[in-house]
Regions:
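Histidine-centered divalent-metal-coordination microenvironment in nucleic-acid enzymes
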Residues: 28, 51-92, 101, 110-114
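Catalytic "initiation/cleavage/transfer" segments centered on a nucleophilic residue
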Residues: 2-27, 32-41, 89-169
Length: 169
């Protein structure tokens, strides 16, 4: 809504930004096994929200060359924006999480769980990603180019094996 009074417009924008600050649909954190409660995975499952948990990152190396402490990356995904301080921090506290990250791209962060786009980093198996609350790791991480590559592989297989037709039972 346009304002004639520029000060009122600035105040309105400031209130709007303050309300939105710290609110997003996707949040990430790190969990160190030695400082997390034994049942931290169960606590996440009991939330009934979409969560992805990386495989244990136990092969990561710091820039100095020394190994990083083993840790998990956790991605929480919600259907609507949530406030970090009042809604997300209590969850992170209950699982012994360290730090927070507001995630703009669920796909990008989900791919980071296994370092799919970082070949210089230790690689982790996507099969080991824990999916909770209806989160679909493969559905989130699949890129349009993956479909093209799959179709190309199928066509190569058909050609190499001289398959001309098939019969469905």
């Amino acid at each position: 809504m346009p304002y004639k009074d520029k000060d009122k417009e600035k105040e309105s924008k400031a209130r709007y930004e303050a309300k939105r600050s710290g609110r997003t649909r996707n949040f990430a954190t790190v969990v160190y096994p030695e400082s997390a409660p034994e049942d931290w995975i169960n606590k996440l499952e009991e939330l009934h929200v979409s969560v992805l948990v990386s495989p244990l990152h136990d092969k990561d190396i710091n820039p100095s060359g020394e190994p990083k402490k083993p840790h998990y990356h956790v991605l929480l995904m919600f259907e609507s924006p949530k406030d970090f301080e009042t809604q997300i921090q209590p969850i992170f506290d209950s699982i012994g999480a360290v730090g927070r990250e507001l995630v703009n791209s669920a796909r990008g962060y989900a791919r980071y769980l296994c370092h799919l786009d970082n070949p210089e980093k230790a690689q982790y198996s996507p099969v080991e990603v824990r999916q909770m609350g209806g989160a679909d790791y493969y559905g989130i991480t699949q890129l349009p180019t993956d479909d093209v590559r799959l179709i190309s592989e199928i066509m190569d297989f058909i050609e190499a094996n001289e398959i001309f037709s098939f019969f469905e039972f």
